[in-house]
Amino acid sequence: QAGTRKKQVGMFFWLWQGYHYAHGQMNDAYDATKILEKYGADVLFRQDSSVSPAGQFHFWGEPLFGYYRSSDTWVMRKHLQMLTDAGVDFLVFDATNAYTYSDRVKELISVWYEYLKDGVNVPKLAFYTNTSSGDTMRRIYDEIYNNAALKKQYPRLDELWFNWNGKPMIVGRSAEADDTVKSYFTIKESTWPNAG
């Protein structure tokens, strides 16, 4: 028997599409599956070429809605619909490389908030930090959670946060967090695949 504890389903969620070096024409997006099929593993993994430049963000394959930008609100709505229909409880935004994607998060909040006001049980939101975790958690706090303009625009904003032990959850390194961050969030310790 699994026990009586309520289980929740969370998903890692990326907001990089259209950011960093992946900002050209989306019909020229770097698709790892197509590169591998056409050029082989050496071009995809070992060579720096115009087909698969090192340091460029790659799609693993063509997404259901095409090579979209994370700022596309139509795609956000479709994602929200599918995630809600699937019963996903929360999303964890990838901020592991110290990019907060705050403008994209704010756009996503505007879509999520519409549905929240209409009574939809939307997936709640959280962040995962790793690189420069303390600084990144503080920027997320300042730019999103403690943003006076956002709170004024969205009076029920706090209802969008995924809470753990009575406070919004964030994944990070608690040893790097300042007192404000430690007080505001429940910090779940960041783990990394290659960490010793």
Per-region residue spans from a language model:
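Glycan-processing catalytic domains of CAZymes
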Residues: 1-196
